[in-house]
Amino acid sequence: MCAIFGLIDYNHTLNAKQREKLLRVLSEECEVRGTDATGYAFNHNGKLTIYKRPFAAHKVHLRLHDDSNVIMGHTRMATQGNKLDNRNNHPFPGKVGNISFALAHNGVLHKIGRAHV
């Protein structure tokens, strides 16, 4: 199975380097749940940014911006889909109207062709 983790720092209590360090610890601790891919979704300049790579967390180096204070992370153990195809790795981008969002899940989705958002 995979792991989902995150950080919310609305008051900007931590600077970008401190957030990076904390997320590194969280993601590396989550490697026991998946080493096939690591990904992050975060805010920057009022927009959603998704950064993901087909590597274990200890090989992924996240660089955050000072305004990035809401971050979601995911470590993946591939059970379906090629881990080298980054489209299969989390988080996934989504959009409803003008609202962008990131999605990560734990488990296998069946009948994806029937899913509607």
Range-by-range predicted roles:
Residues 1-108, 112:
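N-terminal glutamine amidotransferase
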Residues 115-117:
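Conserved small/polar residues in nucleotide/adenosyl-binding loops
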